């Protein structure tokens, strides 16, 4: 059985983002105007960044769960350019992460527990099915990888 651990993260996240877009995951009206954290200077360049972030959060919860908003904020943070002063690490936007988690909960892919958010059995099978599709695509491109 193919799992999330068996395929490259970038291809899995891209494919998951496409599937989430097909599932009509909710998109807040402010996504076109916000930065993804204090450490960023501009908004994301990609128009579908919301779906990519939701897919990335879903993958992180699958791998590291149970996980809370604070840990995810740290994962999506970065160094802030402060001019002449030394750079410091700043956490990512908590509002973006909270809203993404709420949308994933509405779809039934993630649920709240006292320890943090975890992937539901539906979410686990959703990601495993996508991982199988990604693995099949990779094997079609490079047949030598079929033995792995």
Swiss-Prot record:
InterPro entries: Ribosomal_eS19, Ribosomal_eS19_archaeal, Ribosomal_eS19_CS, WH-like_DNA-bd_sf, WH_DNA-bd_sf. It holds the Pfam family Ribosomal_S19e. GO terms for biological process: ribosomal small subunit assembly; translation. One of its GO terms (molecular function) is structural constituent of ribosome. This is Small ribosomal subunit protein eS19. SMART domains: Ribosomal_S19e. Part of the 30S ribosomal subunit. Signal peptide: none annotated. May be involved in maturation of the 30S ribosomal subunit. Belongs to the eukaryotic ribosomal protein eS19 family. GO terms for cellular component: cytosolic small ribosomal subunit. The keyword Transmembrane helix does not apply. Keywords: Ribonucleoprotein, Ribosomal protein. The gene is rps19e. It comes from Methanocaldococcus jannaschii (strain ATCC 43067 / DSM 2661 / JAL-1 / JCM 10045 / NBRC 100440). Gene3D superfamilies: Winged helix-like DNA-binding domain superfamily/Winged helix DNA-binding domain. It comes from the Archaea.
């Amino acid at each position: 059985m193919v799992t999330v651990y068996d395929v490259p993260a970038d291809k899995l996240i891209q494919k998951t983002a496409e599937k989430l877009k097909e599932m009509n995951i909710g998109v807040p009206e402010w996504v076109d105007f916000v930065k993804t954290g204090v450490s960023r200077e501009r908004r994301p360049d990609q128009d579908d960044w919301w779906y990519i972030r939701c897919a990335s959060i879903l993958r992180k919860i699958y791998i590291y769960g149970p996980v809370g908003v604070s840990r995810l904020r740290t994962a999506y943070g970065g160094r802030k350019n402060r001019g002449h002063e030394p750079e410091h690490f700043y956490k990512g936007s908590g509002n973006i992460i909270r809203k993404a988690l709420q949308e994933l909960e509405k779809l039934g892919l993630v649920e709240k527990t006292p320890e943090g958010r975890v992937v539901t059995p539906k979410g686990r099978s959703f990601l495993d099915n996508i991982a199988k599709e990604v693995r099949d695509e990779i094997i079609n491109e490079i047949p030598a990888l079929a033995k792995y």
